[in-house]
Amino acid sequence: TKNLKNFFLNKSKIIDVKFDKIILSPGININKCLLSNYLKKNLQKIISDLDIFYEFRPEILTISITGTNGKSTTSKLLHDILKRHGYDVRLTGNIGNPILEEKGIKKNTILVVEASSYQLAYSKYFRSKYSIILNISNDHLERHLTMKNYISSKLRCVTNQKKNDILSLIHISEPTRPYL
């Protein structure tokens, strides 16, 4: 895109620039980073790498897998099964290549996306045709602060699903059920 600008900042640089979108790396905790105040004022503009991918390639079949435990194992297993059956399948997200680094994606490519709560927390419009939520238990509360926030992050993988999309809930515990 022609109008894309990069800004490199240090502690002494004051941000007074207006952005349409802010793509936040999943590893950045907005409560503890140098740009905390700016990011908190611009929460509605923060999106994820998953959103950027979906914005440019909505036709690509994605299968998102999230949960507190078992994401990597389940993602790798599903990837290997699909690959063995001859599909052009990629392992992305929190495992494999970052989704925006995948090259050679064609219309028939399937993406298995291991989606962490950090990736999903600021996702606005990523859509996954198939979403699998394995389990949700107390974890990452140092980042999400409350169980409600953590569960809300995990559920973002289904927020934009359509009527014919599929959600699979596996081993959902009692504390999670009120949020579903």
Model-derived features: where do they sit?
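Single conserved hydrophobic/aromatic residue that forms the stacking wall/gate
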Residues: 170-180
